[in-house]
Amino acid sequence: MKLHDLKPALGAHRKRKRIGRGIGSGKGKTGGKGMMGQKARSGPNPSPSFEGGQMRITRKMPKLRGFKNRWRIEYQIINTGQLNNVPDGTELTINAMIEQGWVQPAKPVKILGDGELERKLTIHAHKFSASARARIEAAGGAAIETPWIVERRSRSRGPNPPRHHRKAEATPGA
């Protein structure tokens, strides 16, 4: 027996039913689209919020308007008052905050100025509020911003390289 002699078993492949080819075919006349209303016609359907000309509920109620910004960056917040249990003179990096269980590695970290800071700390974070920076520097410490690099995944080629690598790859002979 050779590969070209192989055939599927009888009844394994059912023939495709052609739609709209007469009422005797089993899928004729309306072709599986039900009664012939607007949604049975060719072309796009009305939007999900369309109510046949009646004022739609999304326009009646202001709270249902607007949109969700897909590029919004949601920060994890740490207040300066929470940093008083760290020993004096410590360099507090983002990795140290992750090890302490204060933040998760998936989102950027922002330090806010709620609460007094009594320790001299060098703090690394992605963002600082103006009041937090002032409190850290008033206590004799330093606020160092580290960039937040987002790795957006593309479906075809895996994760995209970070921005600072892209220019080096693009320039020939570099």
UniProtKB/Swiss-Prot annotation:
Give one GO biological process term.
Answer: translation
- Cite a single Pfam family from the UniProt record: Ribosomal_L27A
Query: GO molecular-function annotation terms?
Result: rRNA binding; structural constituent of ribosome
Show the GO cellular component annotation of the record.
Answer: cytosolic large ribosomal subunit
Region Disordered, as annotated, extends over 1-56, 150-174
Q: Which keywords does UniProt give here?
A: Ribonucleoprotein, Ribosomal protein, RNA-binding, rRNA-binding
Gene3D superfamilies in the record: 3.100.10.10
Composition bias type Gly residues, residue spans = 21-35
Q: Which PANTHER family match?
A: 50S RIBOSOMAL PROTEIN L15, LARGE RIBOSOMAL SUBUNIT PROTEIN UL15M
**Summary of subunit composition and partner proteins:** Part of the 50S ribosomal subunit.
Protein family (similarity comment): Belongs to the universal ribosomal protein uL15 family.
What the protein does?
A: Binds to the 23S rRNA.
Q: Supply the HAMAP family for this chain.
A: Ribosomal_uL15
Record-given protein name: Large ribosomal subunit protein uL15
